[in-house]
């Protein structure tokens, strides 16, 4: 290798080392499923044409996101995970990464090489560090138990689909005289596909006699934000006394049973009586016979000593119907 080539290689290595050592990462943020702008911030002070430059971006694993080779895009060098997800803005020299996912966070590098008489020479490099955010849903409080005085109520609060991992979650009880924080049992989970977090907290809060009205809300803390739930109004109700069994209920029930029994007895007795008509008829016949005999005795008592023939006939007539009637009943 001649001295010229050795010297040129040394200069190239020196320039790259200088660029790498002095390169500072620019922190940028993007939201989940949105677009991130990966800057290059190259100042083309010499007004070089894109046909003289090679521009490309790579991630921290050295996978190529985009390459513009002498003014033409080269998709063959792009990693499959980035195909169709990038677009280059020639005016701002920003690379737009679309449909950002949690796994896209990390360091990205922009390289600019110039093609001269001696080949490609690196003239610019910039690092940028991408962080991905996803807003948690507004925390939502769910009441598990009823609210009464001198008893604890059970609450849960939950928020989902957020990133990065939340730091803390707690309840706040606000009354007329004080504001109190309540911790609870926190549960976190992370989706294996999206990388987003879900979080919930469960806790109990006790109300004293002097609390007439209050509000409860839930707070979710992340690295940079706090998210609040809607205020949940609390108006503890007085405990409902347990009523003892009332005596009048038992009395009414007993009365109904007795009345039903009497009605049933009378119904059965009447039905049985209707099924035996001969007994009544016999009693009626006996009563008629007794009356006839009594009449006859009265006739005999008042009978005159001498009865004319006509009177005897009349007496005979009076006796005959009675005897016939008695015979008919027998």
Curated annotation (Swiss-Prot):
Key words, A-Z: Adaptive immunity, Cell membrane, Disulfide bond, Glycoprotein, Immunity, Immunoglobulin domain, Membrane, Receptor, Signal, Transmembrane, Transmembrane helix, Ubl conjugation
Pfam family, one: V-set
Transmembrane segments: 248-268
Location, primary (coarse class): membrane
Glycosylated residues (UniProt): 33, 135, 146, 154, 177, 192, 198, 213
SMART domains: IG, IGv
Location of the protein in the cell: Cell membrane
UniProt KW Disulfide bond keyword: yes
Residues covered by the Ig-like V-type domain: 33-127
Signal peptide interval: 1-22
InterPro entries to which the protein is assigned, alphabetical: CD86_IgV (IPR037677), Ig-like_dom (IPR007110), Ig-like_dom_sf (IPR036179), Ig-like_fold (IPR013783), Ig_sub (IPR003599), Ig_V-set (IPR013106), T-cell_Activation_Regulation (IPR051713)
Cytoplasmic side: 269-330
UniProt topological domain (Extracellular) ranges: 23-247
Summary of the function given for this chain in its UniProt record: Receptor involved in the costimulatory signal essential for T-lymphocyte proliferation and interleukin-2 production, by binding CD28 or CTLA-4. May play a critical role in the early events of T-cell activation and costimulation of naive T-cells, such as deciding between immunity and anergy that is made by T-cells within 24 hours after activation. Also involved in the regulation of B cells function, plays a role in regulating the level of IgG(1) produced. Upon CD40 engagement, activates NF-kappa-B signaling pathway via phospholipase C and protein kinase C activation.
Protein name: T-lymphocyte activation antigen CD86
The species this protein was found in: Oryctolagus cuniculus (Rabbit)
Gene this chain is encoded by: CD86
């Amino acid at each position: 290798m001649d001295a010229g080539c050795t010297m040129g290689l040394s200069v190239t290595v020196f320039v790259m080392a200088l660029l790498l050592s002095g390169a500072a990462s620019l922190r940028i943020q993007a939201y989940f499923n949105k677009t991130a702008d990966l800057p290059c911030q190259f100042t083309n002070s010499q007004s070089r044409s894109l046909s003289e430059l090679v521009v490309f971006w790579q991630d921290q694993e050295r996978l190529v996101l985009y390459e513009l080779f002498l003014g033409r895009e080269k998709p063959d060098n792009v990693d499959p995970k980035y195909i169709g997800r990038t677009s280059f803005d020639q005016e701002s020299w920003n690379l737009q990464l679309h449909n950002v996912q949690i796994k896209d966070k990390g360091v990205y590098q922009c390289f600019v090489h110039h093609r001269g008489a001696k080949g490609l020479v690196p003239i610019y490099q910039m690092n940028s560090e991408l962080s991905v955010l996803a807003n948690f849903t507004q925390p939502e409080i769910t009441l598990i138990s009823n609210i009464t005085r001198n008893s604890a109520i059970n609450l849960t609060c939950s928020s989902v689909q957020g990133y990065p991992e939340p730091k803390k979650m707690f309840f706040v009880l606000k009354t007329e005289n004080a504001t109190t924080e309540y911790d609870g049992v926190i549960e976190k989970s992370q989706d294996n596909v999206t990388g987003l977090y879900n979080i919930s907290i469960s806790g109990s809060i006790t109300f004293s006699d002097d609390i007439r009205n209050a509000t409860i809300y839930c707070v979710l803390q992340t690295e940079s934000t706090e998210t609040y739930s809607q205020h949940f109004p609390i108006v503890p109700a007085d405990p409902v006394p347990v009523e003892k069994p009332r005596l009048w209920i038992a009395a009414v029930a007993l009365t109904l049973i007795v009345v039903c029994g009497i009605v049933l007895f009378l119904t059965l007795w009447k039905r049985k009586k209707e099924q035996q008509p001969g007994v009544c008829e016999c009693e009626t016949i006996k009563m008629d016979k007794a009356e006839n005999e009594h009449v006859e005795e009265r006739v005999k008592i008042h009978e005159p000593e001498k009865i004319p023939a006509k009177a005897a006939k009349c007496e005979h007539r009076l006796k005959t119907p009675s005897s016939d009637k008695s015979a008919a009943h027998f």
